[in-house]
Curated annotation (Swiss-Prot):
Pathway: Amine and polyamine metabolism; carnitine metabolism. InterPro entries: CaiE, Hexapep, Transf_Hexapept/Carb_Anhydrase, Trimer_LpxA-like_sf. Residues 187-196 have a biased composition (Polar residues). This is Carnitine operon protein CaiE. It holds the Pfam family Hexapep. One of its GO terms (molecular function) is transferase activity. GO terms for biological process: carnitine metabolic process. Residues 173-196 are annotated as: Disordered. HAMAP family: CaiE. The keyword Transcription does not apply. SUPFAM superfamilies: Trimeric LpxA-like enzymes (SSF51161). Keywords: Repeat, Transferase. Overproduction of CaiE stimulates the activity of CaiB and CaiD.
């Protein structure tokens, strides 16, 4: 793992969290219980404080940063998709930020809300509970349905289960030279296939 102290502040990581060895945590970063931090994520607490609350996930290639005297927060069971950028914002409890979305300074995403992939949430945006946000700039298009929230929660549970699976079996290795016969497939713990 790449952990760096900065001006006397050392990242805090709960022992039940999983932080991928290629992720980087710098300075004023607080990671809660059961959190998943994916490969190549960068949590740079060299200006403001970064808080990832219990059960949340920060996926591959995400960036968290913020200005001085600000907190960038991902609430409990928050779900931050691959490549998303969070800068000085607050992501509410049980909310999802889609892949490659950008959430700017002072923005607040309401709890149980979903930000669609590749959306841009402007600085100072104030969301409400259970909104579906999309676009550039993002706007609320409707409420999140019960089915969508259920799907989001199943996906978040997959990442919560992945924490234990990674602690139990993830390790560095050398590649095989060819695919073995009858190669098994990995199985998730729940069916999260999107319904069409």
């Amino acid at each position: 793992m790449s952990y760096y102290a900065f001006e006397g502040l050392i990242p805090v990581v709960h022992p039940t969290a999983f932080v991928h060895p290629s992720a980087v945590l710098i300075g004023d970063v607080i990671v809660g219980a059961g959190v998943y931090i994916g490969p190549l994520a960068s949590l740079r607490g060299d200006y403001g404080r970064l808080i990832v609350q219990a059960g949340a996930n920060i996926q591959d290639g995400c960036i968290m940063h913020g200005y001085c005297d600000t907190d960038t927060i991902v609430g409990e069971n928050g779900h931050i998709g691959h490549g998303a950028i969070l800068h000085g914002c607050v992501i509410g409890r049980d909310a999802l930020v889609g892949m490659n979305s950008v959430i700017m300074d002072g923005a607040v995403i309401g709890e149980e809300s979903i930000v669609a992939a590749i959306s841009f949430v402007k600085a100072g945006f104030r969301g409400e509970k259970r909104q579906l946000l999309m676009g550039t700039p993002a706007r609320a298009v409707r409420n999140v349905s019960d089915d969508e929230l259920h799907w989001k929660r199943l996906n978040t549970k997959e990442y919560q289960d992945l924490v234990g699976r990674c602690h139990a079996s993830l390790h560095e290795t050398q590649p095989l030279r060819q695919m073995e016969e009858n190669r098994p497939r990995l199985q998730g713990t729940t069916d999260v296939t999107p319904k069409r």
